[in-house]
């Protein structure tokens, strides 16, 4: 096999409870993570050198790019001498709370396992994923999961189909900065995850929408006041409920009326830098050999 293509899907958080800071610097969380049909497309081809080409949204360079980080890690761990060319069609915005970098990292782990015949077990892939970033293990599997720890301990959930509208203001938010402010401001968690899980188990999108909450909104909305404005606009335009994803600044609304969603999309797409009509899906990656 000389070439492989992977679709790497974004995620949103239907809840995010921040429960405290651990000794290793990470934060203990309880969250419901959900894959959505917004995706980057990556093509991997055997080569003598390592090179990443990107179209679409700009991406970091060097080890700040999680694709490069995974490549270098695997080359060292498995003593791989050959390189790889990666062509990235970047559709998931950077620093948006949608795990775009983590999705690309997960895609790289799976693609290079096949391209370089590494024959990694599922546990080995997850172990490598966790070393790269807290959201990467989820992105390997995707779907709907209750995640605990730093986001690596999973329980599968079965969410009903939901149509979503994503809105991102023209600002980038960096996760570490938001968690650092959470610690300094000494906020307390909403503990929304239990209610969201119960609503999912009942298959009730109205209860899901009513209970979605993200603790980090308390911090990010201070940095980016337009987040509250976006939420108000989505609710006025027919969203059943809305919340910020990850550390932000992307906000999503859950809709049960497709016509209202389409109208909201048309009204907002000229105002904000990124507006995307999306839906929930049951996978994190899709491979094309």
UniProtKB/Swiss-Prot annotation:
ATP binds at residues 93-103. The active site is at residues 11, 135. GO terms for biological process: isopentenyl diphosphate biosynthetic process, methylerythritol 4-phosphate pathway; terpenoid biosynthetic process. Signal peptide: none annotated. InterPro entries: GHMP_kinase_C_dom (IPR013750), GHMP_kinase_C_sf (IPR036554), GHMP_kinase_N_dom (IPR006204), IspE (IPR004424), Ribosomal_Su5_D2-typ_SF (IPR020568), Ribsml_uS5_D2-typ_fold_subgr (IPR014721). Keywords: ATP-binding, Isoprene biosynthesis, Kinase, Nucleotide-binding, Transferase. Pathway: Isoprenoid biosynthesis; isopentenyl diphosphate biosynthesis via DXP pathway; isopentenyl diphosphate from 1-deoxy-D-xylulose 5-phosphate: step 3/6. It catalyses: 4-CDP-2-C-methyl-D-erythritol + ATP = 4-CDP-2-C-methyl-D-erythritol 2-phosphate + ADP + H(+). Its EC number is 2.7.1.148. One of its GO terms (molecular function) is 4-(cytidine 5'-diphospho)-2-C-methyl-D-erythritol kinase activity. Pfam families: GHMP_kinases_C, GHMP_kinases_N. Catalyzes the phosphorylation of the position 2 hydroxy group of 4-diphosphocytidyl-2C-methyl-D-erythritol. Belongs to the GHMP kinase family. IspE subfamily. This is 4-diphosphocytidyl-2-C-methyl-D-erythritol kinase. It comes from Thermoanaerobacter sp. (strain X514).
């Amino acid at each position: 096999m000389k070439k492989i293509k992977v679709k790497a899907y974004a995620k949103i958080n239907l809840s995010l409870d921040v429960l405290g800071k651990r000794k290793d610097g990470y934060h203990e969380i309880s969250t419901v993570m959900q894959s959505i049909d917004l995706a980057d497309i990556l093509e991997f081809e055997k080569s003598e050198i390592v090179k990443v080409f990107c179209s679409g949204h700009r991406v970091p360079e060097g080890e700040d790019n999680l694709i490069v980080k995974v490549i270098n890690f695997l080359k060292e761990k498995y003593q791989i001498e050959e390189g790889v060319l990666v062509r990235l069609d970047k559709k998931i915005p950077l620093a948006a709370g949608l795990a775009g970098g983590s999705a690309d990292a997960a895609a790289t782990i799976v693609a290079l396992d096949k391209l370089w015949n590494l024959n990694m077990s599922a546990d080995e892939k997850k172990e490598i994923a966790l070393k790269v970033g807290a959201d990467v293990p989820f992105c390997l599997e995707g779907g709907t999961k209750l995640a605990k720890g730093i986001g690596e301990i999973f329980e599968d959930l079965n969410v009903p189909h939901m149509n979503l509208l994503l809105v991102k203001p023209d600002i980038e938010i960096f996760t570490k900065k938001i968690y650092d402010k959470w610690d300094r401001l000494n906020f307390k968690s909403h503990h929304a995850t239990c209610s969201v899980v119960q609503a999912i188990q009942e298959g009730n999108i109205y209860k899901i929408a009513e209970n979605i909450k993200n603790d980090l909104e308390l911090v990010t909305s201070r940095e980016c006041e337009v987040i509250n404005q976006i939420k108000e606009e989505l609710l006025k335009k027919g969203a059943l409920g809305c919340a910020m994803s990850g550390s932000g600044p992307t906000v999503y609304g859950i809709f049960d009326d497709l016509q209202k969603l389409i109208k909201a999309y048309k009204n907002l797409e000229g105002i904000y830098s990124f507006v995307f009509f999306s839906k929930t899906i049951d996978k994190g990656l899709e491979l094309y050999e």
